Amino acid sequence: MFSHISDTHLGLAQYGLEERENDIYGTFNEAVDTSIKEHVDFVIFAGDIFHVPNPSGTAILQMANALRRLKEGGIESFFVLGEHDISRIRSTPVPYVYHNLRFAKYIGDGKPYLHKDIFLAGFDKIRKSELQNFHERFAQVDKAAREHKGHKILVMHQGITEINEFAGELGSADMPKNFTYYAMGHLHDRFLKRFSHLGGPVAYPGSIELTTSEGIKDAQKGFYMVDVSSAEPNPNWVRLQTRPQIAERAEFANLDEAITQVLQKIATLDKKPIVELRISGQDIAPDIVQAQMARLAANTLYCTWKIMHADKNNSSVLSERPTNIDEELIRLASSALGSEDLARLAIRDLLDPLAENKIQEVTQLVIENFEQFRRKKK
C-alpha cells in the first residue's frame, strides 16, 4: 500500500494570514502521520510541494521534518515537481535538496525506478508548448513499463483535457498506456477516472487544503491510500480535517436573517470558518452590507462579500470563471507580454514578493533573469 498526496502548496498564507499557512501545515502533517500509522510502504508527492519556488525556511523545514518521520518509519518518499516548484530563473529547485540528502527520491526526469517489485516513473510539469518534445520519452518509458510484470505507477503533474478542459495540457491518448496506476497532480479537485486505452485508473487526490484559485466553498480535501496487494490497484480516499468554509447566497432584503443563520451554523463548528456571502437584490447599499457583515467578524477567521449582478438571462455573472485562476492569469499575461516565459516570471516569481513589498528580492530576480537572457543571446 502507498499514499498518493498532491498539491500541498506548503508556505501558502492565504489572505496573508499566518493561520491559513498553519492550516496547510496541519493537513499536510495529518496526511503524513496517517500514512505512518497505516504502515504504507511508500509515499508519492505528485508536484506543487511548495507554493512558490523560493519557499520560506518554515515551509522547507515542514517538508524536511515530514520526510524524516517517514524515513524513520521505514517509508520511502518519491516526488516530481509542479509548476509552483520550478522557477524560470533558478537552476536548482528547492525539493532537490531532499533528494541529495537522501530524504526522498526525485523521479521527475522520466527515468524508471524499481522499488521492490513496483515500477515507478515520473515527469515534472510539462508546458503545453513542450509536449511535442516528450512523445519519444513517453514511448520509451511505456516500453519499459510493458516489460515489467508487477505494478507500474506513472507520476505526473498535468491536467488532462477530458477531466478539466480549462486546466488540461494533454489528452489521455497522449499518455503512456502500460501503467496500472496514474498518480496525478495539478488539478485541485478530486477525480478518479478510467480510460479504456490506459492500463489503470487516473487519480487526482486534489489539493490538501482550499487554495486561493479555488475560491471559498464547502469542499472535502484529502489524499489516496492505494492498495496494490492484488492485480487491480484499489485507491481509498482519506479525508483530511480542513478549516470549515461557508459560501452562502443571500437576498439584500433578507440580509439580517441570512447573517443570523450563518452565525447559528458557525456556533456548531470547532474552528473559526472562512465565510463568503454572495448578495443579490435591488438597490444594494454597500454601507449597510458592511455594517451587517461586521456581525460575523469576531466569529470568523476571514469573511468577505460580493454583490451578484444578474445578466439579461437572469444568471449570475460571477458564476462563470476558469477553474484554474493561476493558468488563466498566465494566459492573459502571455497575451499582453508576448512571451510565456515572461508571463511565468511575472506570475510565479514576482507577484508574491511584490505583494509583500520585497523590493530587493524582486530586483535580484529581475537582474538574474536579465543575465540569463543575455547569455542566451550570445
Where are these regions (language model features)?
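A short, well-ordered alpha-helical element
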Residues: 29-39, 139-140, 255-269
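N-terminal active-site segment of His-dependent metallophosphoesterases
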Residues: 1-66, 146, 353-364, 372-378
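Accessory, non-catalytic peripheral segments of nucleic-acid enzymes
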Residues: 230-378
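Short loop/turn motifs at secondary-structure junctions
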Residues: 39, 119, 150, 178, ...
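His/Asp/Glu-rich metal-coordinating catalytic cores
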Residues: 42, 53-220, 224-227
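Domain-start "cap" segments at the beginnings of catalytic or binding domains
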Residues: 1-22, 210, 221-243
